[in-house]
UniProtKB/Swiss-Prot annotation:
GO MF term (any one): thiamine-phosphate diphosphorylase activity
Family recorded in the similarity comment: Belongs to the thiamine-phosphate synthase family.
Catalytic function, reaction form: 2-[(2R,5Z)-2-carboxy-4-methylthiazol-5(2H)-ylidene]ethyl phosphate + 4-amino-2-methyl-5-(diphosphooxymethyl)pyrimidine + 2 H(+) = thiamine phosphate + CO2 + diphosphate; 2-(2-carboxy-4-methylthiazol-5-yl)ethyl phosphate + 4-amino-2-methyl-5-(diphosphooxymethyl)pyrimidine + 2 H(+) = thiamine phosphate + CO2 + diphosphate; 4-methyl-5-(2-phosphooxyethyl)-thiazole + 4-amino-2-methyl-5-(diphosphooxymethyl)pyrimidine + H(+) = thiamine phosphate + diphosphate
TM region(s), chain numbering: none
One Pfam match: TMP-TENI
Protein name from the UniProt record: Thiamine-phosphate synthase
Naturally occurring in which organism (per UniProt): Bacillus cereus (strain AH820)
Gene3D superfamilies listed in its UniProt record: Aldolase class I (3.20.20.70)
Keyword DNA damage listed: no
Amino acids binding 4-amino-2-methyl-5-(diphosphooxymethyl)pyrimidine: 44-48, 79, 117, 146
Keyword Metal-binding listed: yes
Residues holding Mg(2+): 80, 99
Amino acid sequence: MSRISKAEMSKLLSVYFIMGSNNCTKDPLQVLREALEGGITIFQFREKGEGALTGEERICFAKELQAICKEYGVPFIVNDDVELALELDADGVHVGQDDEGITSVREKMGDKIVGVSTHTIEEARWAIENGADYLGVGPIFPTSTKKDTKAVQGTKGLAHFREQGITIPIVGIGGISIENTASVIEAGADGVSVISAISLAESAYESTKKLVEEVSRSL
């Protein structure tokens, strides 16, 4: 197996859904199914924060979500937990700046997908040099889902990455909705990652379809 190509990674980032059990008011398995039917291109399991599952329950829940992703042929990424990603034989892992270092993550993950959250050009260059397949850049807009976020960058912050010669695939993160998706793509992102825009939508299916349309219209 070899590392994923830039072109393939770029396509996968189009509509990137992130979810844990505590991000939904409905059955999360049903929400994921609807999102997959609607056209998400990649999924990240992020079980964090108040009311999050732990231990065996967390592992069982991850396996259920992974099985659904497999049915649809959509990559299943684990947030921040390299050991869990390896245990599940997940398609990849996404790490932040305060998590395990990228060099050790790449070593453990082999050729699987590795994404890194970055907030500065320096962080981006370090991640690229040490084996990141894509960058998560943000928060682009204010968000209430993550309590530990850095300062809002706006689409200008994202455009700055491209202006500074960062050519690796980028997914915009933070406060992204159907209404502002186009501006994120126009600023240079390959895709958008969302939590509540899908997980709390009245219809996860309809919301996903609209996000897919917005992204393909803006690319």
